[in-house]
Amino acid sequence: MKTIKIWSLLCVILLVSGCKQNNWLDWKTQNELFLMQNAQREGIITTPTGLQYECIFPGLATSARPDNAKMVEIKYHGELINGYQFDSKDSYIGYVNHFVPGFCEGLKKMNEFGIFKFYIPYDLGYGNQGNGTEGTASHIPPYSTLIFYVELKDVI
């Protein structure tokens, strides 16, 4: 009898974990399709790494540009392809190389006072692990494309 209960419990666990894995694979596919369609939009630039971005306002061409050794002050909000906003700051100061790779790459393309929108594929973001605790406001599921609206206020 104990063996049957253990096997039953094991089967339920496998079924639940399999469903969750399928959900992540469906989410991955949705994100990949989003990026493929987004790349066709007018004004979208795709880099060799797969980062997509659009320039909303170019900023000052004569101003300093970010690099890994510099700090920046930015205003941003981040969301997923389904519109879920996971983060937003009116003012954030940090080193360029402390962001996820896609965000870092995008910042380096900006001029001071520029406004860009980044579309960061999961492999340049939080990868197949995601970020944060599931069920919390800041949770980012595995395989998520990150969409950031970024204003570069200052290069420090």
Residues of each region from the PLM?
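Sec-dependent bacterial lipoprotein signal peptides
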Residues: 1-17
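Cross-family detector of peptidyl-prolyl cis-trans isomerase
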Residues: 5-7, 19-156
